[in-house]
């Protein structure tokens, strides 16, 4: 009998922790990202910021906007604008579905994390709905309660 293939943890490069706090994530999609030669070197070094980023569907193409990838320190002439829009590589039906979902009021696409998979940079895009302030407080209260329960269980054993 063949052994089960164990999945390695993703080679995580960056994570957008603020997105989980500010948004309710409805669905996620994995997308490739079109990068230039020096950009991929900076990404592999972990020199990127997803915090203010978002994705947009334009002309039946998905674009990642407002994501900062620092210029590669050795790239000089070949470096590009750190804040440029980057194309997301998705199937046509996925782009069409995302376009329909984001057409609703209050729904947006946010990058959740960027990682390497088989040598290629991938972005996990979340279809997100904005939280209200009372929702954020409610989430924090629930997390505090869960933490207290875990402490009590840990002290018990």
Swiss-Prot record:
Task: Print the keywords alphabetically.
Answer: Cytoplasm, RNA-binding
GO cellular component terms, A-Z: cytosol
Q: Where in the cell is it found?
A: Cytoplasm
Q: Which organism is it from?
A: Lacticaseibacillus paracasei (strain ATCC 334 / BCRC 17002 / CCUG 31169 / CIP 107868 / KCTC 3260 / NRRL B-441) (Lactobacillus paracasei)
Instruction: Quote the CDD domains the UniProt record gives.
Output: SmpB
Chief subcellular location equals cytoplasm
Tell me if RNA-binding is a UniProt keyword of this record.
Answer: yes
The UniProt GO MF terms for this protein read: RNA binding
Q: Looking at the Swiss-Prot or TrEMBL record, what is one Pfam family this protein matches?
A: SmpB
Entry similarity comment = Belongs to the SmpB family.
NCBIfam families associated with the record: PRK05422.1 (NF003843), smpB (TIGR00086)
Top-level taxon of origin: Bacteria
Q: What is this protein called?
A: SsrA-binding protein
The UniProt entry's GO biological process terms, in alphabetical order, are: trans-translation
What job does this protein perform?
Required for rescue of stalled ribosomes mediated by trans-translation. Binds to transfer-messenger RNA (tmRNA), required for stable association of tmRNA with ribosomes. tmRNA and SmpB together mimic tRNA shape, replacing the anticodon stem-loop with SmpB. tmRNA is encoded by the ssrA gene; the 2 termini fold to resemble tRNA(Ala) and it encodes a 'tag peptide', a short internal open reading frame. During trans-translation Ala-aminoacylated tmRNA acts like a tRNA, entering the A-site of stalled ribosomes, displacing the stalled mRNA.
Q: Which InterPro entries match?
A: SmpB, SsrA-bd_prot, SsrA-bd_prot_CS
